[in-house]
C-alpha cells in the first residue's frame, strides 16, 4: 500500500457517496499557500545559508553528525545539505544507499533523488520555501495526494473537485 491514508479516504468517500455525488476537497491548499512545516523550516535554512558560507555549513553539519545528541544538532546537520537533499531526507525513510542494501538486485530506474533534484534545478533563483512548494506541486501532489484522492473517490462513484487548484 503506497500510502496508508488511502484506507480512511476510501471509507470517507464511500460514506459521502451515500448522500452526495460531488464533494469539494482542500487538496493542494497546503502546497499552494505554504501550509507544511517543512516550508517554514525552509525559510529558517534560507536565513542560515545567507549568513553562513557553504563550506562552513558543510563542515558544521559533518561534525555535528558525529557528535552525541544536543539541541540544534539536526539543524546543523540539515543546514550542511543542499535544499534538495533536505527535501529527500524529509520525505523518504531510506536514502538511496540504504535502500540498495535491502534489495537483492540493483535499482536501475531513476532514483527519487535524481527525479526530485531535477525540479530544484528548474528554479534555482527562488527562495527555499518556494522551491519546496514547486517541487511538491510537481511530484508529491500529483503522484500521491491527487492520485489517491481521485482513485478512492472514483472507486466509490464520487466526483471529487479541488477548487484550490482550479485555474479559473
Question: What does each of the following model-derived ranges do?
Answer:
Residues 1-3, 123-136:
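Structural motif
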Residues 1-112, 128, 151-168:
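ATP-dependent adenylate-handling active sites, centered on carboxylate activation for C-N bond formation
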Residues 109-122:
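A short, charged helix-loop
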Residues 112, 124-126, 141-144:
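Short, flexible segments with low predicted structural confidence
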Residues 137-151:
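Short Ser/Thr-interspersed hydrophobic loop/turn segments at strand-loop and sheet-helix junctions
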Amino acid at each position: 500500500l503506497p500510502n496508508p491514508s488511502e484506507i480512511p479516504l476510501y471509507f470517507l468517500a464511500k460514506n459521502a457517496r451515500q448522500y452526495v455525488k460531488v464533494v469539494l476537497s482542500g487538496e493542494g491548499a497546503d502546497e499552494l499557500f505554504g501550509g507544511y512545516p517543512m516550508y517554514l523550516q525552509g525559510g529558517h535554512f534560507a536565513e542560515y545559508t545567507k549568513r553562513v558560507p557553504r563550506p562552513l555549513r558543510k563542515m558544521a553539519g559533518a561534525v555535528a553528525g558525529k557528535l552525541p545528541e544536543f539541541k540544534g544538532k539536526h539543524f546543523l546537520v540539515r543546514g550542511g545539505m543542499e535544499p534538495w537533499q533536505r527535501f529527500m531526507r524529509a520525505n523518504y525513510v531510506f536514502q538511496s544507499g540504504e535502500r540498495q542494501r535491502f534489495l537483492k538486485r540493483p535499482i536501475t530506474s531513476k532514483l527519487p533523488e535524481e527525479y526530485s533534484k531535477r525540479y530544484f534545478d528548474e528554479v534555482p533563483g527562488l527562495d527555499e520555501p518556494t522551491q519546496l512548494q514547486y517541487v511538491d506541486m510537481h511530484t508529491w501532489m500529483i503522484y500521491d495526494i491527487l492520485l489517491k484522492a481521485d482513485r478512492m473517490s472514483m472507486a466509490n462513484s464520487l466526483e471529487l473537485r479541488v477548487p484550490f487548484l482550479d485555474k479559473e
